């Protein structure tokens, strides 16, 4: 019987959105334990080597990290398998580049570059609120931050804006109909739209109905909804495509149009 934590991850069993091919090796980097789940994170090594192509091998990634060039959410990270996840800000001081991990419409983490101004904050979904010892109110966010003394109006499923330097809450958005949201799980992963209504199902999962900018309607569980803006004004810059998923036919037409204009 195996004792203790698992230390390996086979390539075939790695999450599909990492986009690792089956034939280049047997193993994949197993993410360290951290603020995001294994199936919902992107290890630093995959981001630097496979996405940005700043290194060819894992050894080179280690050399980059060990020089303390890479910051995630304003903190230097030297662990190459550190699990970066949704909404994390990855900064590379040396090149002056900043990235925010957000999903594209195919449910993969997009390489989304942001300005140094935008890299100063991140949005977090409130997972849980409670009153601790001596009556101190706490809240826990989707990236495992515990914040004490929050605004009493902030409830579960709301989104808070955090200043990365101080770790303090600067603003918040209520979970409400008419607000812009991004889907962070399920079949509609990566789609962005405005919340139209919420079906309450006591004892089961609440269902949220969302309408995207093209007028398409879809529904998902409440746990998959991440509010990213008040009204239809997003608080973060959106990746290419603005979270609108095209049908296969629409994608084909778009590709052909691009081909004709270039050819």
Swiss-Prot record:
Oligomeric and partner information: Component of the small ribosomal subunit.
Species name: Xenopus laevis
Purpose of the protein: Component of the small ribosomal subunit. The ribosome is a large ribonucleoprotein complex responsible for the synthesis of proteins in the cell.
Molecular function, one GO term: structural constituent of ribosome
SMART domains, per the entry: S4
Coiled-coil portions: none
Record localization: Cytoplasm
Pfam families in the cross-refs: 40S_S4_C, KOW, Ribosomal_S4e, RS4NT
Keywords associated with the record: Cytoplasm, Ribonucleoprotein, Ribosomal protein, RNA-binding, rRNA-binding
Domain S4 RNA-binding stretches: 42-104
InterPro entries (alphabetical): KOW, Rib_uL2_dom2, Ribosomal_eS4, Ribosomal_eS4_C, Ribosomal_eS4_central_region, Ribosomal_eS4_central_sf, Ribosomal_eS4_KOW, Ribosomal_eS4_N
Gene (UniProt): rps4
GO CC annotation: cytosolic small ribosomal subunit
Annotated GO biological process: translation
Keyword Repressor: no
Family to which this protein belongs: Belongs to the eukaryotic ribosomal protein eS4 family.
Taxon lineage: Eukaryota, Metazoa, Chordata, Craniata, Vertebrata
Keyword Nucleotidyltransferase: no
Stored PROSITE patterns: RIBOSOMAL_S4E, S4
Protein's UniProt name: Small ribosomal subunit protein eS4
């Amino acid at each position: 019987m195996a004792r203790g934590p698992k230390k390996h991850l086979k390539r075939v069993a790695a999450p599909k959105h990492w986009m690792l091919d089956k034939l280049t090796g047997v193993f994949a980097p197993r993410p360290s334990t951290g603020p995001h789940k294994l199936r919902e994170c992107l290890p630093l090594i995959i981001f630097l080597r496979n996405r940005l192509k700043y290194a060819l091998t894992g050894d080179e990634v280690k050399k980059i990290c060990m020089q303390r060039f890479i910051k995630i959410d304003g903190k230097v990270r030297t662990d190459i398998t550190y699990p970066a996840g949704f909404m994390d800000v990855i900064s590379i001081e040396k090149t002056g580049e900043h990235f925010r991990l957000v999903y594209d419409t195919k449910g993969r983490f997009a390489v989304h570059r942001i300005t140094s101004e935008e890299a100063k904050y991140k949005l977090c979904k409130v997972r849980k609120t409670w009153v601790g010892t001596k009556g101190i109110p706490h809240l826990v966010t989707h990236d495992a931050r515990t914040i004490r003394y929050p605004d009493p109006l902030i409830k579960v499923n709301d989104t808070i804006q955090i200043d990365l330097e101080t770790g303090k809450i600067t603003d918040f958005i209520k979970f409400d109909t008419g607000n812009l949201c991004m889907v962070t799980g399920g079949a509609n992963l990566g789609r962005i739209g405005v919340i139209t209504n919420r079906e309450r199902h006591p004892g089961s999962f609440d269902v949220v109905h969302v309408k995207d900018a093209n007028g398409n309607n879809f529904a998902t569980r409440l746990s998959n909804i991440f509010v990213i803006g008040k009204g239809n004004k997003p608080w973060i810059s959106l990746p290419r495509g603005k979270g609108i998923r095209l049908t296969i036919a629409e994608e084909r037409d778009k590709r052909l149009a691009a081909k004709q204009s270039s050819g």
